Each structure stands twice: as C-alpha cells, then as structure tokens.
Amino acid sequence: MASASSGPSSSVGFSSFDPAVPSCTLSSAASGIKRPMASEVLEARQDSYISLVPYASGMPIKKIGHRSVDSSGETTYKKTTSSALKGAIQLGITHTVGSLSTKPERDVLMQDFYVVESIFFPSEGSNLTPAHHYNDFRFKTYAPVAFRYFRELFGIRPDDYLYSLCSEPLIELCSSGASGSLFYVSSDDEFIIKTVQHKEAEFLQKLLPGYYMNLNQNPRTLLPKFYGLYCVQAGGKNIRIVVMNNLLPRSVKMHIKYDLKGSTYKRRASQKEREKPLPTFKDLDFLQDIPDGLFLDADMYNALCKTLQRDCLVLQSFKIMDYSLLMSIHNIDHAQREPLSSETQYSVDTRRPAPQKALYSTAMESIQGEARRGGTMETDDHMGGIPARNSKGERLLLYIGIIDILQSYRFVKKLEHSWKALVHDGDTVSVHRPGFYAERFQRFMCNTVFKKIPLKPSPSKKFRSGSSFSRRAGSSGNSCITYQPSVSGEHKAQVTTKAEVEPGVHLGRPDVLPQTPPLEEISEGSPIPDPSFSPLVGETLQMLTTSTTLEKLEVAESEFTH
C-alpha cells in the first residue's frame, strides 16, 4: 500500500506529497506537539547507505542503492534517466492494457499467475509499437490476466487505469526508501508506482495466488492494493516496478505522519528525518506525542481492529514480517483555523468526473464494510479518512494502511534478529518471527494507538420531552456523560446524576444494554423490563408474577394466530 511523498520526505515506507508544509518546525507546531532536542535523536541506520561524491558537473552527488542524483538534479536508476523510465512505463502500460482489452474475460486460472508477456519497443517503432525518442527497451508484464481481475475487483476500469497513468506525465517524488527506490504518482493522485528489487518482485509473484484468495474472501483490507507488476529492460538492466493505490491524497493537508511497527528499538525519527517538510515519525515519537492514543467510535474501532487482525493473519501465513502501519493525520480543527493562501492550494486533476474517485480504495473504505456510518464523530466529509479525536477532543482524519509487506522471514532476517537480540531485549526488536511480530503489532495498534470511545446512548423521546426519565434522573442540569483518556488504556464512561448520592439506586453501565432473559427461562419473580424502562439510570425492574407473565404470553399468542 503506498502513498505519495513530498519533496525530501520519508525514507521509511511511503510518505505524503505535501508541498504546503514549509518546514519541520511549522508541521510540528500545527499539530501542537513538542519535539525533543536534536541531541536526543538517534541517526537512522539508512544514513549509512548514502554516499556523497565530490562535486563535478554531471556526476552523481548523492546515491542511495540504485538511485542517484547528479548536480543538475537529474535522477537516474540503474543508469536509466528518470524521464526515460517514465516514458517507457507509460508506453508499456498503454500497450499491455490495450492488448489485454481485446482478449475475452474469463475466470482466473492457476497458470495465469505465472504468465509473463514481453514486447520490444525499438526507438524507430514497429508494426506493434509506436516510435519514441528513448533508447530501445523491452517491457514485460507479469500475470496480466490476474492483475486485470484485481483491478476489476477494486472497481478500476481499463480506460480509467490508462487515463490515470498514461494521459499526463508521471510525477516523480524526491523521497526514496532505504534501498533507493524510485516513486512516481499519477497526475490525478490515484496511483503510486514504485521500483522494487528482484527478490521483492519474485516474492510478489509467489504471493499472488494467496493474495487472490484473500481478496476474494475479504476485499476490504488495509494491505497494499496491487494493480500491476512490470519490468523495463533497458541498457542491460532490469527495472521492476509495481503499481499500487495511493494512500495519502495530495488534496488533503497532512499535519503529521507516523510509521508504526509496535517496536521500540531504534524506533525514533532521526535528526535528518526531522528536518524534512513532512517527517515520518516512529513508535517512540508517537508514545511521546500522543500518549493517550487516538479515540474512535466503538463501531469504527471494532471494524479497524478486526481488519488488522485479519490482515495480520494473512501476513503471518506467508511468513511476512517487518511491515508497518503508515498513518497520516489531518487535524480538521487546525485546518479550519489555518489561513488559506496560494501556497496551501493543491493542484489535482479536476477534469475527471468527481464520482470516479469513489471507485478507488481509501482507508475508510478498507474497514467501513463492518463499521456503521455515523456515531459521535461529526464530520460532514471524511475525504476518505477515518474520523477520530485526540485527548484534547480535536477532530482528526486518519489515513492508514499496511506497507512494506514484500519481505519474508528468511535467513537474513533471522540472523539480523539473532544478533540484535544478543545486545537488546528480543521482544523490542522490530525484526521478529512472523507469529510474534503479528501479535505484537496488533496489540500495539489496538491497545496503544487506537482507543475506543464508549457508546453514548441516544436519548429517548420521553427524555427529549422531559417526561418520566427526567423525573427519575432528577434535574437535567445535574446529568452528563464524559469520557476521560487514560495511559493505562482504560476509558470508562462517567455518568454524574443526583442518583449517585441517593441510596438504593443502581446506575449500571450506560454503554451496555441489559439482557432480557428468554421467555422460557422466566420463572416466578423473574424481573422483566418494562417497555418504558431506560437503561441509563438502572431503574429498579418491576417484579411480575407468573400469572401476569402467562397472561402476556396468551395475548401475544392470540395476536400471532389471528
């Protein structure tokens, strides 16, 4: 699952393309968060992968993995310029999607996951390919029929896919992962294209049958949505790319961003990361910034945790580990107070009909299959985000997704965990065996990061009209319901009424409805709640005799038979 990333943004996972945030200081201030001093920050391990070369015109001045940038700002990847790579990608996708549309639709077969189609693009053109001004290249498409099914499952039509990726130039993102990956975002902000290593592409191919089965069973998922896997062969090098959904829309200003694993070992953003326009903070930063966690409606919380549990089970079954939850936060209240200027306006493609956006997956759509609309979160437009609140009561929109899943727990990772565990507590290391990693990941997300707001009972009509409920509860001014966050993770609803000081009145829990025993279990003296009974105050139940119960049953039976 991927997201767009800004200028020099995160080197971990996928970041948000947010040109409106001018500096790290402003980003932190906007979210009301105090940052530690630079001397307290550990340098990220990936800094060791960056090599600086003495300045010379046309020579690379910075290189991370296969990605290098020269003094003129031109990016190359495996000795292929970024502009040539973007052109080759668009030419190849245009051809492969067009040729696939001429083939009749059918069910996906097992062999479809292993098909690789290849076509040569000479610069002078051929009877199948157009002429172009790039060097000759070959374009490979992996499992075209299977990926066509995936796109259809997510509601992406072939012409929409081509329009997004090939109608306008791709936008290169300046950030890269620790391995030096290249990132592109489509002009309409819908898709991310990322270069992947050979092992990652190979692992995705092996993952496809299980991925297909999982999507059939659970189309709503926070896992990355893979839309295509391709390879550009140019200059004797293979450049493999994957097309995914864009997690963070550029049209929404992100105030802060986190990459969370549930680990504490070296899980703090580096000083270099904090200097970026929109830094990607980590687990220790989150625990310091938001110790009380983020509050979601009960339905939303339950749906989110269930989705995380299901996704982690899938990842564990494939022995996948070291994945992260990328979470970007839009603070609605801060955004409403921020002055609008030309710098904060985002240029997104408006020529496309607005309803088209609904065809693509968002964080909200990934879990809303089980979450009911509405609740205590009052936002007119979620813009694809999950509504939440912080401990101050500020309204938030969360954009989340699981990223970095194309890694399996193999020998290298086992070795990495072994030597780390010799020096540090093994349970705090992020590289862990898949089963333990999944359990720790879920526990951290559902107990520390996300918290449940207790359900607020809807007042009955009698309560609104000031009838019997008001008389039982006393003065309406003496009754309120609040929730208070706690670092321990316990969040209880507090009901304050005059009944608290009146003996013999049991308040009960306002967020739980009393269970009425089945009729066949009712014996003499068993309490049966009256239809006008309100669970808020815990009014003493009326005691009905057996004769009254039988009388009601006879009336109900006569009404049913007639």
UniProtKB/Swiss-Prot annotation:
**GO cellular component annotations of the record:** cytosol; focal adhesion; lamellipodium; nuclear speck; nucleoplasm; nucleus; plasma membrane; ruffle membrane
- Kindly list any coiled-coil regions of this protein: none
Q: As annotated in Swiss-Prot or TrEMBL, what is the tissue specificity of this protein?
A: Highly expressed in heart, placenta, skeletal muscle, kidney and pancreas. Detected at lower levels in brain, lung and liver.
Mind listing the UniProt keywords for this protein, alphabetically?
Answer: ATP-binding, Cell membrane, Cell projection, Cytoplasm, Isopeptide bond, Kinase, Lipid metabolism, Membrane, Nucleotide-binding, Nucleus, Phosphoprotein, Transferase, Ubl conjugation
On subunit structure and binding partners, the annotation says: Interacts with RAC1. Interacts with TUT1. Forms a complex with CDH1/E-cadherin, CTNNB1/beta-catenin and CTNND1 at the plasma membrane upon calcium stimulation. Found in a ternary complex with IRS1 and DGKZ in the absence of insulin stimulation. Interacts with DGKZ. Interacts with PIP4K2C; the interaction inhibits PIP5K1A kinase activity.
What does it do? Answer: Catalyzes the phosphorylation of phosphatidylinositol 4-phosphate (PtdIns(4)P/PI4P) to form phosphatidylinositol 4,5-bisphosphate (PtdIns(4,5)P2/PIP2), a lipid second messenger that regulates several cellular processes such as signal transduction, vesicle trafficking, actin cytoskeleton dynamics, cell adhesion, and cell motility. PtdIns(4,5)P2 can directly act as a second messenger or can be utilized as a precursor to generate other second messengers: inositol 1,4,5-trisphosphate (IP3), diacylglycerol (DAG) or phosphatidylinositol-3,4,5-trisphosphate (PtdIns(3,4,5)P3/PIP3).
Please identify the protein, giving its name as recorded. Answer: Phosphatidylinositol 4-phosphate 5-kinase type-1 alpha
The gene is PIP5K1A
